[in-house]
A protein has these predicted regions:
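A polyanion-binding, active-site-adjacent surface
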Residues: 1-219, 245-251, 261-270
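Asp/Glu-rich intrinsically disordered low-complexity tracts
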Residues: 215, 220, 225, 231, ...
Length: 270
């Protein structure tokens, strides 16, 4: 199990990797910034939405518009705050005009989400809306049928409690759905109290037995074989010397100060 500092460091590395992503040509050209996600790197509860909107694209943080205000309110009503959860989206870049994500975009971006989940190791994932729910369930059943129903699912290599609810932005368009969303949220504390579901046994790599080396006395080698052995020894010595020099150079390079990029914590990410 990774320590809190190790998780933050791993998320930092993934954050910088995602910032340079250009897998989706259109999104890379039209985005203002990559909205990686924000919150507690050691959260038991993780929210997964659809994609950044205009406000999120400008600020680089998820759920900072009206939908974000509703999310904050709902969290407060169950005794939680943003610094206790982690919030991410299926897409890290804003689709132009807030259109729906394209299947190819989801395919391109899902690796980042699954790696986030693997690093954070939440016990409960609350999917906000159809896109997140369908992706993490590997199923096309819609949110109208699934909202408020918890189930244990495999997400990547881990078993989690998956809890689909309406997306806050969609609920704002239909006021009656806000009440439904509020009612569903009230089940989250109980789900968290259950703890992590039983995990599958870890995969064990089959061991490969190496054949024992057979030592041969120099006198047992034929003249040609002895010469070849001498050449091999000379080459090995030269290679080892070259490698030692390369390692020294690499160590010196590693000692160079890192570029002055902002740490994600300075951006309020995690």
């Amino acid at each position: 199990v990774a320590s809190p500092d190790e998780r933050r460091e791993s998320l930092k590395e993934l954050f910088h990797e995602a910032r340079g992503c250009v897998r989706c040509t259109q999104l890379a050209q039209t985005r203002h910034t990559v909205v990686f996600g924000a919150g507690n790197a050691n959260a038991d509860l993780m929210f997964v939405g659809e994609a950044p909107g205009r406000n999120e694209d400008e600020r680089g943080l998820p759920f900072v518009g009206q939908a974000g205000k509703l999310l904050d309110t709902l969290l407060g009503e169950i005794g939680l705050a943003r610094d206790q959860v982690f919030i991410a989206n299926v897409l890290k870049c804003r689709p132009p005009g807030n259109r729906d994500p394209h299947p190819a975009e989801i395919e391109n971006c899902q690796e980042y989400l699954f790696r986030q989940i693997e690093l954070i190791e939440p016990t409960v994932i609350c999917t906000l809306g159809n896109f997140a729910t369908k992706l993490l369930r590997h199923d096309t059943t819609g949110i109208m049928r699934l909202h408020g129903r918890a189930e244990v699912r495999m997400v990547g290599p881990r078993s989690v409690r998956l809890f689909p609810v309406f997306h806050p932005a969609a609920a704002l368009y239909t006021p009656s759905n806000v009440d439904v969303l509020r009612q569903d949220f009230r089940a989250l504390p109980e789900l968290l109290a259950l703890g992590a579901p039983e995990q599958p046994p870890p995969l064990v790599e089959p061991s490969v037995e190496e054949e024992p080396l057979v030592e041969v006395e120099a006198g047992e080698l034929a003249p040609g074989e002895a010469a070849a052995a001498g050449d091999a020894a000379a080459v090995g010595t030269a290679t080892a010397s070259a490698d030692a020099g390369s390692l020294g150079a690499a160590d010196e390079a590693a000692a160079e100060p890192a570029s002055a990029e902002p740490h994600p914590a300075q951006l309020g990410l995690f």
